[in-house]
């Protein structure tokens, strides 16, 4: 029996959605990082797990369901949720002509399974009981709040001008996007701005991602996916309709499907980096380095 490959399983799930014309990182619900939550803790799952679960609401493990006196409805299937477990490993190095062993911690991807609360019987449904109050701000006001907060805090320069180009320049540490009036709808303006803003978090003074890739290279594709994910979740975080914010063609879907088939770890890596980027944009939080 073939050994279970978590990366392959994750990639296949994403590919299945793309084959149906669904872009997993562009969800119809509002709230971005908070669509799917743990029933027990109330905390939202990670960005990657949001993509895998694909359905907002509360989730429980089999044990949590039985501990609450409930059961899973007949025919309902579980969903994979992944997490990183820090594992000790020994690394051999040559130091001053001597072979030395050094212990280090590395993150290893693990998984467990959960069920949506609506697929359970005998437990009290949470529904929308724990939802946060609706923001008094409009989606555009929420988006402007994000933009002003980030560019007011960071040294990155924002250029909004009449042009036909949108790009981030690492050498100048500046984001350039066409003026809002050049877009058919305001959601497209903010999805473009958030895409380039996510790129800017990769600067060496911020999250220090590899920004050296040229168009068509693997490193370029990886960074593009980080920006796509970051933009999609920021748009949703602000309460905008992601279906309006992004123009997706068959070629777009086929392009990403091809990339995922070539690299089964691509979506896992990009989602992790995008989540760090989104948190940095919203809060300035930097990930704690692994020792």
Predicted segment positions?
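N-terminal accessory/interface modules of nucleic-acid-binding and processing proteins
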Residues: 1-291
């Amino acid at each position: 029996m073939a050994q279970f490959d978590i990366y392959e399983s994750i990639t296949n799930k994403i590919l299945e959605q793309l084959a149906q014309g669904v872009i997993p990182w562009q969800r119809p619900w509002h709230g971005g990082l908070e669509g799917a939550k743990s029933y027990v803790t109330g905390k939202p799952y990670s960005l990657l797990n949001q993509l895998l679960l694909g359905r907002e609401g509360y989730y429980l493990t089999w044990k949590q369901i039985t501990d609450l006196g409930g059961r899973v409805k007949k025919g309902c299937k579980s969903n994979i949720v992944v997490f990183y477990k820090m594992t000790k490993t020994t690394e051999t190095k040559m130091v001053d002509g001597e072979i030395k062993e050094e212990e280090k911690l590395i993150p290893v991807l693990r998984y467990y399974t959960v069920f949506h609360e609506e697929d359970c019987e005998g437990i009290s449904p949470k529904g929308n009981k724990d939802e946060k109050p609706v923001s008094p701000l409009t989606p555009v006001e929420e988006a402007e709040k994000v933009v002003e907060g980030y560019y007011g805090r960071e040294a990155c320069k924002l250029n909004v001008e009449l042009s036909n180009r949108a790009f981030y320049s690492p050498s100048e540490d500046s984001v350039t996007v066409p003026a809002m009036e050049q877009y058919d709808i305001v959601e497209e303006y903010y999805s473009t701005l958030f895409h380039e803003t996510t790129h800017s978090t990769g600067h060496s003074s911020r999250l220090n991602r590899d920004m050296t890739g040229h168009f068509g290279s693997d490193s370029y594709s990886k960074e593009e996916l980080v920006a796509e994910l970051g933009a999609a979740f920021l748009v949703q975080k602000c309460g905008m309709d992601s279906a309006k914010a992004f123009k997706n063609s068959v070629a777009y879907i086929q392009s990403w499907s091809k990339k995922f088939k070539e690299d089964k770890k691509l979506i896992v890596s990009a989602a992790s980096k995008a989540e760090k980027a989104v948190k940095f944009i919203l809060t300035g939080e930097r990930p704690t380095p692994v020792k």
